[in-house]
C-alpha cells in the first residue's frame, strides 16, 4: 500500500533499493559516489539530497517488487523495519516525523477500540463507547478485507487481520525505539550516524 501511495504523491517518492536505477551522468553530476562513501545507506540518502537539488524521482509503475520474505521469522522483519525507520530519521527527518503521525493513526485507534470493548465486558466503558468501538472495528475489518488484493495472493480474512495487528504493534514498538537512537546495527557492525546519514564511527 505504501508503494502505491508513493506513486500518487511525488514528494514522497524516493529511490528504492534494488528497484533503483540512475544514469551515469546523474551519478557523476550529483556526486553520488562521494555521498555513498560516507553514508550509512544508499537509496534513502539520495532521498534526502536529490529534492534539494531539484532532481525528480519517478516511480516506475511496472516495478512491482516481488519478494520471498514470506518465510522470514518475525525477528528478521523487526530488524528490517528498524533499519527502514532509522534511515528516514537520519536522512529525511521530516518524513520520519510524518511517519510518527502515521504510526499513531495506524496503531492507537484499533488499540483504543479493543480496550473499549474490554471495558464494556468489565462494566467500565459506556454502552455508547462500546458501540462506536465495535462499529470502528467492523469498518476496519471491511477495509482490510478490501485491501487483501494488494498482497498478490488470496489470504483468509482472519490471517490478514492478524497480520495487520502484528504489523501495527511492531511498527509502533520500532518507532518508539528510534526516538533516542543514535545509530544502527547491521551485520554485526554498529554504525554511529549523524545528520544526513553520515557515518561518524563504526565498531564491531
Residue ranges with predicted function:
Residues 1, 28, 33-96:
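Catalytic donor/gating beta->alpha subdomain of glycosyltransferases that bind UDP-sugars
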Residues 1-34, 78, 85, 160-171, ...:
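Long helical/loop segments within the catalytic core of UDP-sugar-dependent glycosyltransferases
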Residues 25, 48, 182:
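Surface-exposed charge patches
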Residues 64, 190-191:
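A short, acidic, flexible beta-alpha connecting loop/helix-capping segment that sits on the rim
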Residues 98, 102-183:
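Membrane-embedded multi-pass helical conduit in multi-pass membrane proteins
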Residues 197-204:
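Short, surface-exposed, low-complexity cationic segments
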Amino acid at each position: 500500500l505504501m508503494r502505491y501511495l508513493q506513486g500518487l504523491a511525488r514528494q514522497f517518492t524516493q529511490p528504492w533499493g534494488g528497484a533503483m536505477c540512475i544514469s551515469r551522468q546523474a551519478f557523476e553530476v550529483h556526486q553520488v559516489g562521494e555521498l555513498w562513501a560516507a553514508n550509512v545507506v544508499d537509496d534513502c540518502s539520495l532521498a534526502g539530497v536529490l529534492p534539494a537539488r531539484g532532481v525528480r524521482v519517478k516511480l516506475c509503475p511496472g516495478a512491482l517488487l516481488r519478494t520471498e520474505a514470506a518465510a522470514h521469522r518475525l525477528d528478521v522483519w523487526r530488524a528490517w523495519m528498524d533499519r527502514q525507520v532509522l534511515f528516514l530519521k537520519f536522512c529525511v527527518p521530516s518524513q520520519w516525523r510524518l511517519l510518527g503521525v502515521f504510526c499513531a493513526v495506524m496503531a492507537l485507534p484499533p488499540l483504543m477500540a479493543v480496550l473499549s470493548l474490554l471495558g464494556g465486558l468489565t462494566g467500565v466503558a459506556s454502552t455508547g463507547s462500546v458501540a462506536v468501538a465495535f462499529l470502528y472495528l467492523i469498518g476496519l475489518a471491511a477495509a482490510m478485507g478490501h485491501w487483501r488484493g494488494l498482497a498478490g495472493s488470496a489470504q483468509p480474512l482472519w490471517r490478514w487481520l492478524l497480520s495487520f495487528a502484528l504489523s501495527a504493534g511492531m511498527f509502533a514498538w520500532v518507532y518508539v525505539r528510534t526516538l533516542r537512537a543514535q545509530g544502527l546495527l547491521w551485520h554485526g557492525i554498529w554504525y554511529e550516524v549523524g545528520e544526513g546519514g553520515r557515518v561518524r564511527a563504526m565498531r564491531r
